[in-house]
Amino acid sequence: MALTTAPTESFDVIVVGGGHAGCEAAITAARLGLNTALFTLNLDRIAWQPCNPAVGGPAKSQLVHEVDALGGVIGRLADGTAIQKRILNASRGPAVWALRAQTDKRLYSHQMLQLLQHTPNLALREAMVTGLETTAEADQQRISGIRTYFGSVYGAEAVILTAGTFLGGRIWVGHQSMAAGRAGEQAAEGLTEALQQLGFQTDRLKTGTPARVDRRSIALDQLEEQPSDAADHFFSFDPAAWVSGEQMSCHITRTTAETHQLIRDNLHLTAIYGGVIDSKGPRYCPSIEDKIVRFADKDSHQIFLEPEGRDTPEIYVQGFSTGLPEPIQLQLLRSLPGLEQAVMLRPAYSVDYDYLPATQLKPSLETKRVRGLFSAGQLNGTTGYEEAAAQGLVAGVNAARHIGGQEPVHFPREGSYIGTMIDDLVSKDLREPYRVLTSRSEYRLILRGDNADRRLTPLGRDLGLIDDRRWQLFEDKLQAMEREKQRLETVRLKVSDPVAPAVEEETGAAIKGSITLADLLRRPGMHAADLVRHGLADADLPLPVREGAEIDIKYSGYLQRQQQQIDQVKRQSQRKLPADLNYAGIGTLSNEAREKLGSIQPTTLGQASRIPGVSQADITALLMWLELRKREALAPPAEAR
């Protein structure tokens, strides 16, 4: 819709939605000097965690480390509000190590609101955004502002949509439903239609959340306790953000034969299995009924009981989301050991909502159809706070650069999980909620959480998101790591040293004369912590320095090989494709490739190669066509020959 009413107020950037993507986008744009406004339906539910009150986990923790390395805030908030932390996959290699923190959800939201309120250049507004104002240009529409439910118009040079599950949101308990973005909060009206009027395609997805149970009604003493085991690990690379508060335990129970029978008997009462809705749900976070159907041979499934905060009795029943009616939900809960007397405080529900398939976006997260309009978070088809926060930061950076007339920042797939995720989103026709996984990256040994600062903090500094203090911390850490690696490569443990027998026994290998500490670390089962225990390393050296030096040394051969692979792939995959390339006119491409390439308009050869339906033969044909055009462009005119 064209701007027909004088704006009530004007900003450089408007962010629509106050979830994890919106907060990250708004703070980023404001810190880059843009006059920014964050519009949200409910200022009391800023950065709410409507599902699991947790941050991190496999691949997700790497995303959080990356956002922090660039100057984002999700890692700082998670460190400041953590009530339990664990290292997942600790027995495996560093490529899949993952920090996961249970957070105090109310404290997390409160601290984010405080941060927003004290960020210069950032205004907060509570309103429902229902329309998008645009201005026609020669070749496409340009965003010029937003319109609210009550008719106010706000001008902006860039708008970032981060509406989460609120566009056309509808929550379901059994076959009963109501319009809502999540329990207790109204859905957003009008914005889906506004996008469709501008020519965007929308579709529907589904997600869900389990019931909340009163802690006081659970026999926790009968259940397996899962205490915190990573109090000295943090998401942020900034020690000023580290908080070591009182930790709380989680507990583990399991489904029973009674649980499974109840579910099988009542499947038809869910909205999905009853045929009421057909929206796709998240593959990697299935409902309990999906688990029973998909894994019919399993007698039992593990269920985690996770506290939602220090000052609330609410327990999140992880692994037990369901779309069954409320009375049956209570029966299901009471079929679990330790929950025979469970009091259900909030029922489980599923929510289906409108989303914007992300093939309509550029890698900068700007829409292809409307200049200055960006989209981030669950609206793009992702699931998870971490995925949302990462997209929010990217959209905030690129909205600021759009206004400043600068080239957008593109995150290459091989350089970060952020890049992997965005490349997947804009290249693949995804029709189910997307979550980041370590298996999605071909370069996961390089893309670890511990080295996210080394990969991305220089970029954050160049962008203006890393201040002098953070930069000095980063440089100090690099210098300390280099000194420690040099020490490990030069200091030798002699067979005659007092600790040598104990080291030989632990590693199961003899020391022949002497061995450098670096070679000792390369032995299976020997770690930096063991060097400290044997007095071979300084216990006062910061843990990130010790662990980073160990990984660099222990896996040096693998790291070098993977870096060589990355460099080789870069040379070809980062070749730019012309924005106006007419794929329909390239006869050597298959019909499907012409259609897919023309629809998605990839920006690089690498992105083109990852589009489903585009074969390696098509990429070869495209490369040959580009080379031919390049030679033709370089050839002298016929009359000059």
From Swiss-Prot:
<dbReference type="InterPro" id="IPR036188">
    <property type="entry name" value="FAD/NAD-bd_sf"/>
</dbReference>
<keyword id="KW-0819">tRNA processing</keyword>
<feature type="binding site">
    <location>
        <begin position="281"/>
        <end position="295"/>
    </location>
    <ligand>
        <name>NAD(+)</name>
    </ligand>
</feature>
<comment type="function">
    <text>NAD-binding protein involved in the addition of a carboxymethylaminomethyl (cmnm) group at the wobble position (U34) of certain tRNAs, forming tRNA-cmnm(5)s(2)U34.</text>
</comment>
<dbReference type="GO" id="GO:0005737">
    <property type="term" value="C:cytoplasm"/>
</dbReference>
<dbReference type="Pfam" id="PF13932">
    <property type="entry name" value="SAM_GIDA_C"/>
</dbReference>
<dbReference type="GO" id="GO:0002098">
    <property type="term" value="P:tRNA wobble uridine modification"/>
</dbReference>
<dbReference type="GO" id="GO:0030488">
    <property type="term" value="P:tRNA methylation"/>
</dbReference>
<keyword id="KW-0274">FAD</keyword>
<dbReference type="Pfam" id="PF01134">
    <property type="entry name" value="GIDA"/>
</dbReference>
<comment type="subunit">
    <text>Homodimer. Heterotetramer of two MnmE and two MnmG subunits.</text>
</comment>
<feature type="binding site">
    <location>
        <begin position="17"/>
        <end position="22"/>
    </location>
    <ligand>
        <name>FAD</name>
    </ligand>
</feature>
<keyword id="KW-0963">Cytoplasm</keyword>
<dbReference type="InterPro" id="IPR040131">
    <property type="entry name" value="MnmG_N"/>
</dbReference>
<dbReference type="InterPro" id="IPR004416">
    <property type="entry name" value="MnmG"/>
</dbReference>
<comment type="similarity">
    <text>Belongs to the MnmG family.</text>
</comment>
<dbReference type="InterPro" id="IPR047001">
    <property type="entry name" value="MnmG_C_subdom"/>
</dbReference>
<dbReference type="InterPro" id="IPR049312">
    <property type="entry name" value="GIDA_C_N"/>
</dbReference>
<dbReference type="GO" id="GO:0050660">
    <property type="term" value="F:flavin adenine dinucleotide binding"/>
</dbReference>
<protein>
    <recommendedName>
        <fullName>tRNA uridine 5-carboxymethylaminomethyl modification enzyme MnmG</fullName>
    </recommendedName>
</protein>
<dbReference type="InterPro" id="IPR002218">
    <property type="entry name" value="MnmG-rel"/>
</dbReference>
<dbReference type="InterPro" id="IPR044920">
    <property type="entry name" value="MnmG_C_subdom_sf"/>
</dbReference>
<dbReference type="Pfam" id="PF21680">
    <property type="entry name" value="GIDA_C_1st"/>
</dbReference>
<dbReference type="InterPro" id="IPR020595">
    <property type="entry name" value="MnmG-rel_CS"/>
</dbReference>
<keyword id="KW-0520">NAD</keyword>
<dbReference type="InterPro" id="IPR026904">
    <property type="entry name" value="MnmG_C"/>
</dbReference>
<keyword id="KW-0285">Flavoprotein</keyword>
